[in-house]
Amino acid sequence: GCPWDSWC
């Protein structure tokens, strides 16, 4: 779940 996470 970008932009909150890093696994975009």
Curated annotation (Swiss-Prot):
The modification 4-hydroxyproline is found at residue 3. GO terms for cellular component: extracellular region. Expressed by the venom duct. Keywords: Amidation, D-amino acid, Disulfide bond, Hydroxylation, Ion channel impairing toxin, Neurotoxin, Secreted, Toxin. The modification D-tryptophan is found at residue 4. The keyword Methyltransferase does not apply. The modification Cysteine amide is found at residue 8. GO terms for molecular function: ion channel regulator activity; toxin activity. It is found in: Secreted. Disulfide bonds join 2-8. Its target is unknown, but this toxin may modulate voltage-activated calcium channels (Cav) or calcium-dependent potassium channels (KCa). Belongs to the O2 superfamily. Contryphan family. The cysteine framework is C-C. Exists in two forms, due to cis-trans isomerization at 2-Cys-hydroxyPro-3. The cis conformation is the major form. This is Contryphan-Fr2.
